[in-house]
């Protein structure tokens, strides 16, 4: 198994900053935005976007944590552990995840969101888009497009969980 770092901490920070600027540029009503981090690493990326929005626009954007396990179609799971303490009706929810692959996690996240309310709009921000979609889902904000083969994996490490920030590509062959 070969593992290669393809994004270091500086490049990751730059990608998150770029996503933040794109969110600012493309949204007229920034005060209606709610960030929805998909557990686990999507939550930490969403927190970083939230911090950058505060620094750049002096905005206090609410953040919710989504657990998609109870809404997945490929895994049967326990109960939903999402943390949604705000009203999402009429808001512009931006789902945030580390990697976009088949689209199944995002579909589950959308199901979770609409089970809690009716947002005006749902967008998607991902740190890495690796392709290979099984569902018609596309990200609105992408940090890095990293085409992979089906056998390769993308591993996102964040300081809060893993002690460092990086993105690695893993080739099992």
UniProtKB/Swiss-Prot annotation:
Q: Which InterPro entries match?
A: PRibTrfase_dom (IPR000836), PRTase-like (IPR029057), PyrR (IPR023050), PyrR_bifunctional (IPR050137)
Question: Motif PRPP-binding residues?
Answer: 93-105
Which named protein is this? Bifunctional protein PyrR
Listed EC numbers: 2.4.2.9
Q: Which PANTHER family match?
A: BIFUNCTIONAL PROTEIN PYRR
The UniProt catalytic activity note for this protein reads: UMP + diphosphate = 5-phospho-alpha-D-ribose 1-diphosphate + uracil
Q: What is the stated purpose of this protein?
A: Regulates transcriptional attenuation of the pyrimidine nucleotide (pyr) operon by binding in a uridine-dependent manner to specific sites on pyr mRNA. This disrupts an antiterminator hairpin in the RNA and favors formation of a downstream transcription terminator, leading to a reduced expression of downstream genes.
- In the UniProt record, the gene name given for this protein reads pyrR
Q: Give the UniProt family note.
A: Belongs to the purine/pyrimidine phosphoribosyltransferase family. PyrR subfamily.
Q: What is the lineage of its organism?
A: Bacteria, Bacillati, Bacillota, Bacilli, Lactobacillales
Q: Name one GO biological process term.
A: DNA-templated transcription termination
Q: How does it assemble?
A: Homodimer and homohexamer; in equilibrium.
One GO term in the molecular function aspect is: RNA binding
Domain of life of the native organism:
Bacteria
- UniProt xrefs under NCBIfam families: PRK05205.1-4, PRK05205.1-5
**Keywords, alphabetical:** Glycosyltransferase, RNA-binding, Transcription, Transcription regulation, Transcription termination, Transferase
């Amino acid at each position: 198994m070969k593992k290669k770092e393809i994004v270091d901490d500086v490049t990751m920070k730059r990608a998150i900053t770029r996503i933040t600027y794109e969110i600012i540029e493309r949204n007229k009503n920034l005060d209606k935005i709610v960030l929805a981090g998909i557990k686990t690493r999507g939550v930490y990326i969403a927190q970083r976007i939230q911090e950058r929005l505060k620094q750049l626009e002096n905005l206090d954007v609410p953040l919710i944590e989504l657990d998609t396990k109870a809404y997945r179609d490929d895994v049967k799971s326990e109960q939903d552990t999402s943390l949604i303490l705000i009203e999402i009706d009429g808001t512009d929810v931006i789902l945030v995840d580390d990697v976009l692959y088949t689209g199944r996690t995002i579909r589950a996240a959308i199901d979770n969101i609409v089970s809690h309310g009716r947002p005006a709009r749902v967008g998607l921000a991902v740190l890495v888009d690796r392709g290979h979609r099984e569902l018609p889902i596309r990200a609105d904000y992408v940090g890095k497009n990293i085409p992979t083969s089906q056998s390769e994996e993308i591993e996102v490490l964040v300081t809060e969980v893993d002690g460092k920030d990086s993105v690695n590509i893993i080739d099992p062959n």
